């Protein structure tokens, strides 16, 4: 039987609810429900017990239309997400309501979004490389299967494009399931992602729907329910226009779905899951927005004092167990390009590999704008990757570091003042830097270049050829936005031939 309380105060997304009699108080993190005058339900989450039989809650939806004195029901349980095979291909919000417009029945099973991290003895410790087909990542900061990967970058340097390309390369090439949590990012990007996934058959709406989509229609009556169950992805969204309560919880909602797929439903073996979060910074930002309203003293740069605790509680759940694995790729917005900001700095500690995107590299027209010297990986070692891969990666880093050191001298005195050896290092480093770029499948419509996936053996061969001086006769432009070294050679020879005409 639900207990009934009444709203006593509303301050933006924070709602105070009074109950009569101390036994009626909901527990911390329990869900409460209030109905707006238009019949829409708003879910609240209990955050604090204030004394005098009052609790302070955060709303998961807009509090417009709520007034003091409105009745609030308690559920006696936290916010939960629907689970089961029929959630494949579906689009949910933070409280587990389908928002894709496709009719659905009531979910038989639901799981609380607040759960304990797996016990230490249940964790898996295997180390396996996850190749992505992106040269700069596979060579210099290889990803770990079942590990945590962070994509760091300021505004507009290409985090979302890179995450979309990773979904394209890994989710398509790999038959497993993907879960995407859109946390406080642009609604347009969520729409683009859904369309991209339908076109590439990661989410299956059926041929009839795809034909109608090609004509510019969006007729959900044509969705094939049996095809939908064969989808390989589930999406959970709480976008920029949502209140902070939803943005602070949607990452946990997506993670709950990923955990369900990883562990199975108790009927046998779990699975290997890909879990994408775009953007983990918004999770922190939402927490800081409500922190002051909840009466907490702000800490460094105005963030909530519980920043490390909240981040740790979530990141510890993203892990691989003996039943299945979660490989997570998290985009991390870096405010004002400052990696020492508490939000990105707290995230760093939890990751196995970091891919740092640099605005200076994007200004050179090199995409993906990955900083090869700032990016790291726990598994960049000869024991795991083999000595050929490791030696090539170290040579690339060495030549780029030398180029970086010489840039000040070049800026002041010019190239002519360098020794012959340094001139040669600079020429090769510039070719290496350009060869780290590559055209993406998801950017074909913008670049006009066909997307490329590059095998790691071809990547190593290409960089070794450049550093050994075998391609010194080709112009630098030949190495920009190409896939394999053969394409660069063909492009270079064409440029040389054209210049002689």
UniProtKB/Swiss-Prot annotation:
Q: Kindly list the places in or outside the cell where this protein is found, as annotated in its UniProt entry.
A: Cell inner membrane
Reactions it catalyzes? ATP + H2O + 4 H(+)(in) = ADP + phosphate + 5 H(+)(out)
Instruction: Supply the Pfam families for this chain.
Output: ATP-synt_ab (PF00006), ATP-synt_ab_N (PF02874), ATP-synt_VA_C (PF22919)
Keyword annotations for this protein, in alphabetical order, are: ATP synthesis, ATP-binding, Cell inner membrane, Cell membrane, CF(1), Hydrogen ion transport, Ion transport, Membrane, Nucleotide-binding, Translocase, Transport
Detail which positions bind ATP.
153-160
Where on the tree of life does the source sit, at the highest rank?
Answer: Bacteria
Instruction: Spell out the HAMAP family in the cross-references.
Output: ATP_synth_beta_bact
Q: A GO molecular-function term, please?
A: ATP hydrolysis activity
Q: What is its EC number?
A: 7.1.2.2
Q: Which EC class is this protein assigned? A: translocase
Q: Which family does it belong to?
A: Belongs to the ATPase alpha/beta chains family.
Native source species: Cytophaga hutchinsonii (strain ATCC 33406 / DSM 1761 / CIP 103989 / NBRC 15051 / NCIMB 9469 / D465)
Q: Which gene encodes it?
A: atpD
Asked whether the keyword Translocase is assigned, the reply is yes
Briefly state the protein's biological role: Produces ATP from ADP in the presence of a proton gradient across the membrane. The catalytic sites are hosted primarily by the beta subunits.
Assembly information from the UniProt record: F-type ATPases have 2 components, CF(1) - the catalytic core - and CF(0) - the membrane proton channel. CF(1) has five subunits: alpha(3), beta(3), gamma(1), delta(1), epsilon(1). CF(0) has three main subunits: a(1), b(2) and c(9-12). The alpha and beta chains form an alternating ring which encloses part of the gamma chain. CF(1) is attached to CF(0) by a central stalk formed by the gamma and epsilon chains, while a peripheral stalk is formed by the delta and b chains.
Query: What's an example GO cellular component term for this entry?
Result: proton-transporting ATP synthase complex
Q: Does the keyword Ion transport apply?
A: yes
* Main location as per UniProt: membrane
Q: What membrane topology is annotated for this entry?
A: Peripheral membrane protein
Q: State the name under which the record lists this protein.
A: ATP synthase subunit beta
